[in-house]
UniProtKB/Swiss-Prot annotation:
NCBIfam families: xseA. Heterooligomer composed of large and small subunits. This is Exodeoxyribonuclease 7 large subunit. The keyword Disulfide bond does not apply.
Amino acid sequence: MSSSLANRNIYTVSRLNSEVRLLLENEMGIVWLVGEISNFSAPVSGHWYLTLKDSQAQVKCAMFKGNNRLVNFKPQNGQQVLVKARLSLYEPRGDYQIILESMQPEGDGRLQQQFEQLKMQLAAEGLFAQTRKKPLPENPRCVGIITSRTGAALHDILHVLKRRDPNLPVVIYPTLVQGEEAAIQIAQAIGRANTRAECDVLIVGRGGGSLEDLWCFNHEIVARTIAASEIPIISAVGHEIDVTIADFVADVRAPTPSAAAELVSRDHRHKQQALHQWQAKLASTMRHYLAQQETQFARLQHKLDKQHPQARLERQQQQLDELSLRLEQKMQQRLATQQQRWDRLSHKIELHSPIHLIRQQRFNLIQQEQRINQSIQRYLIQSRHQLALLSEKLDAVSPLATLARGYSVTRTTQGELVRQSAQVKPGDTLVTQLMDGEILSTVNSR
């Protein structure tokens, strides 16, 4: 008897309970369990103890305070819940029990499971990838709002937009944001906004609520419609702690509707500052361009002064005329471009700034244009005057000018220039060049 017992693996009670606990924890892993709460207690330790049961069985459960503080409701006896748990054994008493890691009301639990499944599916398809998200426009021309016409979210968005950018156009696409038909209506509103293409950013959202209240923003049709939108979309659903599938798919997630309005609006004071910066940049660009043209003209004038032959002078004169014309055309084009830019800026200011400021800035631009045109005209007159002086100097040394003073040039009929009487003999015919024509003569003697 003693020898047979020695060959057996004999457990102590504590060892048996320990190995059973390890077996349960390692082999079973995480389980999801639905049941009714009974015998709920919450002692001063902060841990929760309860029993989960159905019509045929029950099991003891423990939920330690590190996990139960994340539960957003107070469990009640008789309440149906969905729990995420692991199996274990309380070794001192040998009690089989469930260690709870999370707990939700049973209805919320089903929705949460659907949420996680759809989230995993869409993530696998790449709908949450940052690479497919579109940037928000820096200065939206029109903002679309997809929400309930009677909800607090619309009031909050419009209030922020009126305060920050009162002249920003807004288009409201009213839709249900709660209930069975809400998801389809939201998707249709997004599609309608893309078809009409009147806005360059959309805010899709509503105020806070329960998981069921916000569930329309977790529908697959809403997620795929947001992903397919050509217009950037900001999701603004509930409060900062509320997270929906729409938040993951949208190009930008705002924690609240008011925050979404902040994202799409710029303070009108910033726009006035940007206008002043454009004006300063325009003036600096014009001064720099004129300085470059003056330097180039000075170089050309220096070359012209150093080259006196008539043909070269004529070429330089032609180049000067062409450069003057190009300069004038360039200045006119530049002024026209700047005028167009100014007109666009003025149009924006008419929407966002006092009218008298726009008129004053336009008056200043007209004066500046007049001063520039006057400077160009004076510059061209001076250039033509200098060219006339150079032409007079050239005429002073021209052979034609010498003929005009009464001198003549004599050549033989072969075109040889006659400088000495020894070059001719009696009977030769000579051609004498005068200012206004030629004379043929015959040599009688020399």
